[in-house]
Regions:
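Hydrophobic adenine-recognition pocket in adenosine-nucleotide-binding enzymes
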Residues: 11, 87-89, 122
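Conserved active-site alpha-helix within GNAT-family acetyltransferase domains
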Residues: 100, 112, 124-142
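Conserved acetyl-CoA-binding loop-helix of GNAT-fold acetyltransferases
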Residues: 89, 95-108, 135
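Conserved GNAT acetyl-CoA-binding A-motif
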Residues: 110-122
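Short hydrophobic/aromatic beta-strand or adjacent loop that forms the aromatic wall/cage
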Residues: 50, 142-146
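Acetyl-CoA-dependent GNAT
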Residues: 10-14, 21, 25-79, 85, ...
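Short coil/turn motifs at secondary-structure junctions
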Residues: 71-73, 92, 125
């Protein structure tokens, strides 16, 4: 199977438990507080357009997701850039084209909303994720540098 029986659709508030479960399987850690904030922003804020997607099997089981944001901007005018901040594919379904299908649908959805650029942050030591984004035509930004300060 190369993602062929997988349907990509907009994320719904009812997907919370499945998304948190997939993330926990991927990271071997639970982050419900992170997803509480993400879902709050996604489904209750009027400042962001729906952009997050899920990958769903024919039986309704979620096997992956991608979350991003498109800020509406001042006076309801959307920005030409969006962010991709979280992506996850259930480890039992990896290497089947689901991540690529999610990224492609995410890109097409944003393109239809007038987005010209997608930004994301990746740990430079995460070679798997770096390879995934590189193979999906993401490249290091020429204009933005992530700065940090240890405290």
């Amino acid at each position: 199977m190369h993602g062929s029986t997988i349907k990509i659709r907009l994320m719904k508030v009812d997907d919370y438990e499945a998304v948190v479960g997939i993330d926990q399987k991927v990271l071997n850690a639970s982050r419900p507080a992170y997803y509480d904030l993400k879902f709050e922003k996604l489904f209750k804020s009027k400042e962001y357009l729906p952009t997050s997607l899920v990958a769903e099997q024919e039986d309704g089981t979620l096997v992956g997701f991608v979350m991003g944001e498109l800020y509406m901007g001042e006076y309801g005018i959307s920005q030409d850039g969006a962010t991709l901040d979280t992506i996850g594919v259930d480890p039992d379904y990896r290497h089947k084209g689901i991540g690529e299908k999610l990224i492609n649908e995410f890109i097409n959805h944003l393109r239809n909303l007038g987005v010209k650029k997608i930004n994301t942050l990746v740990d430079r030591n995460d070679s798997q994720l770096m390879h995934f984004f590189s193979s999906n035509q993401f490249s290091p930004s020429k204009t933005i540098i992530n700065l940090e300060r240890s405290l």
